[in-house]
């Protein structure tokens, strides 16, 4: 199957470089650090500055896409979903790719897309549930970005995915048991992510985004928040 190369506006061919800030990040005032505005190749002075791509990893249903969009808007950077990139390039949905070409084909394309996006400008990147399992993806993320695991328990994940038929790996006679086994197998690998944010029932998208920002703000080499923001 032909798989065309595509690019997204705002994610060019610049190489990510993690900034070497030597001062502490400012404190959150309760409303978060504000929204940064992109002006060409860099963010406005006095606003939060993202030094590398933030890669959201975790199980299906943990909130990567929803949190990713909100986080990107707050930081004034692009949001990219690796699954959506693959679907656009392949002109097919993820379930269709799995059924037609197999998981191995999908994983290879996934690795290509993630590597390309990591070479672009700092952004927020949401990845598929299996992406972080591949050693080559973990290595690429460690070199060019930072991974943050959105850690959710089985009941929360099941509540979010049980009514959806867009998860190829859950098309089994007992999808909840399948989900439980996937979580058990994958959690030790997700735990290798550099950062971790615990997802909890009842926590809104905005509240979860605040939690992620607070974690990132503890690392000024990743996210700088000026004292006056």
Placement of each model-derived feature along the sequence:
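Hydrophobic anchor at the beta1->P-loop junction of P-loop NTPases
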Residues: 56
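Hydrophobic positions on the alpha1 helix immediately C-terminal to the Walker A/P-loop
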Residues: 67
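Conserved lysine of the Walker
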Residues: 64
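P-loop (Walker A) phosphate-binding loop of NTP-binding proteins
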Residues: 59
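ATP-dependent small-molecule kinase phosphotransfer cores
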Residues: 81-142, 166-167
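Short glycine-rich anion-binding loops that position phosphate/pyrophosphate groups of nucleotides
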Residues: 129-131, 153-155, 202-203
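NTP-dependent small-molecule kinase module
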Residues: 2-18, 23-24, 33-49, 70, ...
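A glycine- and Lys/Arg-enriched "phosphate-lid" helix/loop adjacent to the NTP-binding pocket
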Residues: 143-188
């Amino acid at each position: 199957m032909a798989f065309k190369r595509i690019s997204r506006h705002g994610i060019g061919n610049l190489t990510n470089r993690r900034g070497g800030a030597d001062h502490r990040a400012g404190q959150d005032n309760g409303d978060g650090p504000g929204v940064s505005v992109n002006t060409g190749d860099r963010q406005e002075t006095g606003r939060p500055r993202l030094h590398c791509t933030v890669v959201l990893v975790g199980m299906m249903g943990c909130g990567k896409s929803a949190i990713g969009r909100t986080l990107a808007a707050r930081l004034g950077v692009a949001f990219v979903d690796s699954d959506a990139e693959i679907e656009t390039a392949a002109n097919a949905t993820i379930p269709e790719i799995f059924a037609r070409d197999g998981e191995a084909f999908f994983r290879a394309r996934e690795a290509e897309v993630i590597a390309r996006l990591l070479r672009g400008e700092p952004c927020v990147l949401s990845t598929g549930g299996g992406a972080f399992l591949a050693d080559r993806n973990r290595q690429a993320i460690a070199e060019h970005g930072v991974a943050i695991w959105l850690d959710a328990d089985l009941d929360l994940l099941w509540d979010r995915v049980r009514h959806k038929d867009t998860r190829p790996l859950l098309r089994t006679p007992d999808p909840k048991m399948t989900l439980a086994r996937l979580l058990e197998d994958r959690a030790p690998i997700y735990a290798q992510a550099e950062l971790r944010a615990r997802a909890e029932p009842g926590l809104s998208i905005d509240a979860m985004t605040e939690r992620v920002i607070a974690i990132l703000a503890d690392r000024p080499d990743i996210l700088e928040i000026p004292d006056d923001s």
